[in-house]
Amino acid sequence: MTIAAPLLQVDNVSLEYASAQRVVRATHRVRFDVHAADRFVLLGPSGCGKSTLLKAVAGFVTPREGQIRLDGAAVTGPGPDRVVVFQEFDQLAPWKTVRENVVFGLRATRTLSRAEARERADESLAQVGLTGFADAYPHTLSGGMKQRVAIARALAMRPRVLLMDEPFAALDALTRARMQEQVLELWEQLHFTLLFVTHSIEEALVVGNRVLLLSPHPGQVRAELNAHAFGPQSAGSVAFQQTAQRIHRLLFDLPDAALDDAKVAPLRRPAVRQREALP
């Protein structure tokens, strides 16, 4: 069976930024495809360029070489078809209520009336379990609740791709685990397309169904893994721990030529939509 064309294509993208002393290459010729309803995770150590890559997909950074395409059209700037959830708690306007924070983005698109925007905002808040806090202000919310508002605001925009840049990194371990579960519950309801950045191997396996490994700086593709077999309930299993250890070796210990010995195939464009999960 042939597959549909990818929704998002990152084609040999190299990204650079200027420091005080020199130009730094963040990623080098990174290539991957994301299909509709994928939960695609970019996993790598700090400084590998994964957040910069997410910003390039969002349209905030222009590639030095290569191209990013959404639905076959080149990404040339930000747009409502790609919405980002960051890790910072201060991404909400503190002078607006929870509902007003969600409505603000909807009204900015100039496609919905005030009543329509309010209705969609309430629908999104219900999806993340915050109906009872619609009139609350951000300073009264916990960190996890603020991130749920940010997710509700993003999903209310109905983007083609939801971009999440280490959204739970600043949360305590218990809240982070619950937020991971809630993202998966929302995905089961809505089947949105997710591009998720993390430096946590365990989080990547729980959240993603496909995981792209990026090498230490500058970020280059090491391998792509199929993580369909894993989820919150499998985190303590032997297979989960063995896979996490294998990923660690791929990221830090093994040269590129040793990928095959780790039983993980290097990234290649798939001929079929489904792939076998790692043993």
Regions picked out by a protein language model, each given a short descriptive name:
Residues 156-160:
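A short, proline-enriched helix->beta-strand linker immediately N-terminal to the Walker B motif
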Residues 66-78:
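Conserved ABC transporter NBD signature motif
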Residues 99-108, 118, 122, 226:
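Short helical segment in ABC ATPase nucleotide-binding domains corresponding to the A-loop/adjacent helical element
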Residues 114-133, 185:
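Conserved ABC ATPase "signature" region
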Residues 137-141, 145:
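Conserved ABC ATPase signature
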Residues 58:
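Helix-to-loop junction immediately C-terminal to a conserved catalytic motif
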